[in-house]
Amino acid sequence: MRNLCFQTFYTSKEESNCPLITEIVRIGKRIEKQGLSKDVRSAIFSLRYGHRIIINSDYNDLGGIKRGEILEIVDYDPVKKILLTIGPTQPRVETPVHWMIHHARNEINAIIQLNGNKIIKKLEGKIPSTEKEQIPGSFELTKEVLKTLRTGKSVLIKNQGVLFVGESFKEVEEQVFKNII
């Protein structure tokens, strides 16, 4: 999906050295191994790393996410819509939403977002949903998601996918597999 939501500036085009990158690679492999990738059009994994977050860029092969496909987001200004990043690839359009969720709620350190119609159909009526459809990556979508997350740790994003949050990747992983498998 083409990014119309923000402008990106790179502090470095080199791969991030964040020690948490292996967690994103591991969860991608586990989701692939469990057969979930057939129901998913795209997957976004993000982890808090101090004031920064790490997030995967393009979705290609869930089981084969590489270190170079993971970006370290240094900062994001939602007013100016400027993203400051480290890494060799382009950020996903959903990156600002993940950034703002991580920074709006201190207890959220991990997010897994799975997009696709099959995953939506599996979870419709089982978890809370956003009220309105919003543009992916937009501030309006972030507000809808945060409003829905007030009462839980998962949200069905209308016509997009499902988002799970938690204090750790392990907690979020358990939610994903409990709700989907």
Annotated model-derived regions:
Residues M1-I181:
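Glycine-rich flexible loops
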